[in-house]
């Protein structure tokens, strides 16, 4: 298994797809990296030479913010929004959708499972 940026890449996958297992690298970024290094998109990870793996590793470490650093930056950005008490920060704090979606119905992913409020029966 090739290990890049602290992530074990699956051996049987194509390099294009395998790189997307690294947090912060999607298909488009993966294709840019492969174009820059000159590695064929259809190559399987198990078929990469040690030189090619090192080249990928160097390029990703130098030019891209991935894994722990990126996660830390995102969490610090959210923390800053919460501290300055802006609208987006308040939505994060309350666990509601941040980007303007309606919440009268739906929004269950952010709000969690439905909690029914009990009421007294009439006599």
Swiss-Prot record:
Q: Where does this protein have coiled-coil stretches?
A: none
Record key words, sorted: Ribonucleoprotein, Ribosomal protein, RNA-binding, rRNA-binding, tRNA-binding
One of the Pfam families matching this protein, by short name: Ribosomal_S13
Q: Which GO terms describe its molecular function?
A: rRNA binding; structural constituent of ribosome; tRNA binding
Basic residues bias locations:
101-123
GO CC annotation: cytosol; small ribosomal subunit
Q: What is an annotated GO biological process for this record, any one?
A: translation
Superkingdom in the source lineage: Bacteria
Q: Where is this region: Disordered?
A: 95-123
Its subunit composition reads:
Part of the 30S ribosomal subunit. Forms a loose heterodimer with protein S19. Forms two bridges to the 50S subunit in the 70S ribosome.
Q: Which family does it belong to?
A: Belongs to the universal ribosomal protein uS13 family.
Known role? Located at the top of the head of the 30S subunit, it contacts several helices of the 16S rRNA. In the 70S ribosome it contacts the 23S rRNA (bridge B1a) and protein L5 of the 50S subunit (bridge B1b), connecting the 2 subunits; these bridges are implicated in subunit movement. Contacts the tRNAs in the A and P-sites.
Q: What is this protein called?
A: Small ribosomal subunit protein uS13
Task: Give the organism, scientific name.
Answer: Alkaliphilus metalliredigens (strain QYMF)
Q: Which gene encodes it?
A: rpsM
């Amino acid at each position: 298994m090739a290990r890049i940026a602290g992530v074990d890449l699956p051996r049987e996958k194509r390099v294009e797809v395998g790189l997307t297992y690294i947090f912060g690298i999607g298909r488009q970024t993966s294709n840019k990296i492969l174009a820059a290094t000159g590695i064929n998109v259809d190559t399987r990870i198990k078929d990469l030479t040690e030189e090619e793996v090192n080249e990928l590793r160097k390029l990703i470490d130098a030019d891209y913010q991935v894994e722990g650093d990126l996660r830390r930056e995102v969490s610090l950005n959210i923390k800053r929004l919460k501290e300055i008490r802006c609208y987006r920060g308040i939505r994060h704090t309350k666990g509601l959708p941040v980007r303007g979606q309606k919440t009268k119905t739906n929004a269950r992913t952010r709000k969690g499972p439905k909690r029914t409020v009990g009421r007294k029966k009439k006599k």
